Swiss-Prot record:
GO biological process, one term: purine nucleotide biosynthetic process
Source organism per UniProt: Haemophilus influenzae (strain ATCC 51907 / DSM 11121 / KW20 / Rd)
Entry EC number(s): 2.4.2.14
Record-linked InterPro entries: GATase_2_dom, Ntn_hydrolases_N, PRibTrfase_dom, PRTase-like, PurF, PurF_N
UniProt keyword annotation of rRNA processing present: no
Pathway the protein takes part in: Purine metabolism; IMP biosynthesis via de novo pathway; N(1)-(5-phospho-D-ribosyl)glycinamide from 5-phospho-alpha-D-ribose 1-diphosphate: step 1/2
SUPFAM superfamilies: N-terminal nucleophile aminohydrolases (Ntn hydrolases), PRTase-like
Record-listed Mg(2+) binding positions: 306, 368-369
Name this protein carries in UniProt: Amidophosphoribosyltransferase
Cofactor: Mg(2+)
Length: 505
């Protein structure tokens, strides 16, 4: 999972991109990068492992000159955590092209072989984002004229759609031309467009979430549609075109459950409002299925932070007190998206501490957005017991996650998912709770559709095992499980520790 941002302006963009990336930091804490185009048509690039505030210092910001640029925050779902795979990526031909990407390609092995054999392009890392850049650049390279017009750009995007499979929200910047934003035919990963009027001219901005627009004073215009490309020249002229055949919006449902900030709006849906609906529906299910247990519940406590709005609605529906029983250390990364199981285990207790008075001698209903590996849930339950809870009920705002995600979320193996092959009682025993309940999938999708009924479908593959791109085989799932387990990641990081190319130090 990643966060991306791009700005075409009449004034320097380095500080605005930096500010926007800090608002997208929740989407990835592994690495960050910014690239700009200066007055001499040169790319200025800085990228490294770490948080935005750690990667960019004053000397880096001063070098990132120019009125157009891209930014990226990364959590690796493929490849390694090596700085060589931090984004943006860059190729010098044709023109000079740089790209940032959120998502995951599902046919990268075949594509890497094809791009070398047919285009003689070398992809230096295992990143599918570098591969995607080379595919786009190759199609641009086959356009005969020296200067590209908007239709040429859209032609290259159409050809790219025909080549690649999977999830991709992308921004690419072409020297001497402009910036193009495009989204896969299912719109699995989010991408929004904003504008700002300045000195009688219009600046444009693209970002993964609307919250990034807000901080730098851009007005939300609309979402980039599934399969659409939007091109902005460096002179500020905007063009758009549908570039994919049979494009149908199916956004990732997990964006609304977990990833996106509550103050963002994605595909016409307020993330906050969707979570309120999730809480209402889950509260109604609890009231119905646990009717004999409701009187025993003393207090409803959220697991910070995504579930707070959900838990508040559950407490309202059940008529129970809502309390903050955990205090979060905001300077520790999100545990679900931290690379490595050992890191996740050690991080939970550094991330959360209990307010013991809210647990002591009480029957508590803990509410979390989801249960993925079960690592976090098990430790949270242990903390609640240690704080004196008599009985622990647990409610998940998402259904059981039984299948790996192949579209940009780090759920590589069924064996790493606690719900795979287990029923609710078995999961409850493993995480140590007295009673456990999950949201129904229908209730979850309805919670989002209440905010935008025009969305007819979602990517729900982690719950159903049905992959909307239609190209996922059991062999593919086995392959990524082998490639992405923790031991494999450690091996790749050791092998690729020093591949830093085109990087401002």
């Amino acid at each position: 999972m990643c966060g991306i941002v791009g700005i075409v302006s009449q004034s320097p963009v380095n500080e605005s991109i930096y500010a926007a990336l800090t608002l997208l930091q929740h989407r990835g804490q592994d690495a960050a990068g910014i690239v700009t185009v200066d007055d001499e048509n040169r790319f200025r690039l800085r990228k490294a492992n770490g948080l935005v505030s750690d990667v960019f210092h004053q000397e880096h910001m001063l070098r990132l000159q120019g009125n157009a640029g891209l930014g990226h925050v990364r959590y690796p779902t493929a490849g390694s955590s090596s700085v060589s795979e931090a984004q943006p990526f860059y190729v010098n031909s044709p023109y000079g092209v740089t790209l940032v990407h959120n998502g995951n390609l599902t046919n990268s092995v075949e594509l890497k072989e094809k791009v070398f054999k047919t285009a003689r392009r070398h992809v230096n890392t295992n990143s599918d984002s570098e591969l995607l850049l080379n595919i786009l650049a190759n199609h641009l390279d086959h356009i005969p004229q020296d200067h590209l017009d908007p239709q040429d750009i859209f032609y290259a995007v159409r050809k790219t759609h025909k080549d690649v499979r999977g999830a991709y929200a992308c921004l690419a910047m072409i020297i001497g031309h402009g910036m193009v934003a495009f989204r896969d035919p299912f719109g699995i990963r989010p991408l929004v467009l904003g504008k700002r009027e300045e000195n009688g001219k219009t600046d444009y901005m693209f970002a993964s979430e609307t919250v990034a627009l807000d901080i730098v004073g851009f007005e939300f215009v609309r979402d980039i549609a599934a399969g659409e490309a939007v091109y902005v020249t460096f002179d500020g002229e905007l063009y758009s075109q549908q570039c994919a055949e049979s494009a149908v919006l199916n956004p990732c449902i997990f964006e609304y459950v977990y990833f996106a900030r509550p103050d963002s709006t994605i595909d016409g849906v307020s993330v906050y409002a969707a979570r309120v609906h999730m809480g209402e529906k889950l509260g109604q299910k609890i009231a119905k299925e646990w009717a004999d247990e409701i009187d025993n519940i003393d207090v409803v406590i959220p697991v910070p932070e995504t579930s707070t709005d959900i838990a508040l609605q559950i407490a309202r529906v059940l008529g129970k007190p809502y309390r903050q029983g955990f205090v979060k250390n905001r300077y520790v990364g999100r545990t679900f998206i931290m690379p490595g199981q050992a890191q996740r285990i050690s991080s939970v207790r550094r991330k959360l501490n209990t307010i013991k008075a809210e647990f002591k001698d009480k029957n508590v209903l803990l509410v979390d957005d989801s249960i993925v590996r079960g690592t976090t849930s098990e430790q949270i339950v242990e903390m609640a017991r240690s704080a004196g809870a008599k009985k622990i009920y647990f409610a998940s705002a998402a259904p059981e996650i039984r299948y790996p995600n192949v579209y940009g979320i780090d759920m590589p193996s069924r064996d790493e998912l606690i719900a795979y092959g287990r029923n609710v009682d078995e999961i409850a025993e493993l995480i140590g709770v007295d009673k456990l309940i999950f949201q129904d999938l229908t209730a979850l999708t309805e919670s989002v559709q209440l905010e935008n009924p025009a969305i007819q479908g979602f990517d729900c593959s982690v719950f159903t095992g049905e992959y909307i791109t239609g190209d996922i085989s059991p062999e593919y799932l086995e392959k990524i499980a082998t490639q992405r387990n923790d031991n494999a990641k450690k091996k790749r990081e050791k092998q690729a520790s020093n591949l830093e190319i085109y990087n401002e130090q």
